Amino acid sequence: MKTLFFSLLITAVLVSCSTQSIKADFENNFRSYNELVRWNQFEEASLFPADSISVGYRERLKDSKNVAVVDYRILHIEYDEKKKEAEVKVEIDYYRRSTLSLKTVIDNQKWAYQEEEGKSLWRLMSLLPDFP
């Protein structure tokens, strides 16, 4: 009976650690992505989107060449442990270099934990926001 209890306990601990690791990976990824956007490193940020949206992301990237981001704020994070998905609402302050007028846009980011080439990692499932 003790052996069964300890093996169940060890299994529970391992599953818990795995879940915490997945969430920690998510937090690292979404923060890294937003820091890259904040410092106008859009090319580097383009490594985060899933392959399924990479073409659309690159097109949006071209439209953002004249944009300078000055700040961002994380407004809300919704993390679904079972689905391994997350939504992050980010407020971004920016200006277009041609106008120098400060504007704000909301970026509703969708993230998913995916398996790619034998590796599991968090991928951005939404495009860079449109900077009007």
Each model region followed by its residue ranges:
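Sec-dependent N-terminal signal peptides
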Residues: L4-L14
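Exposed beta-sheet edge and beta->alpha loop/turn motif
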Residues: E81-P132
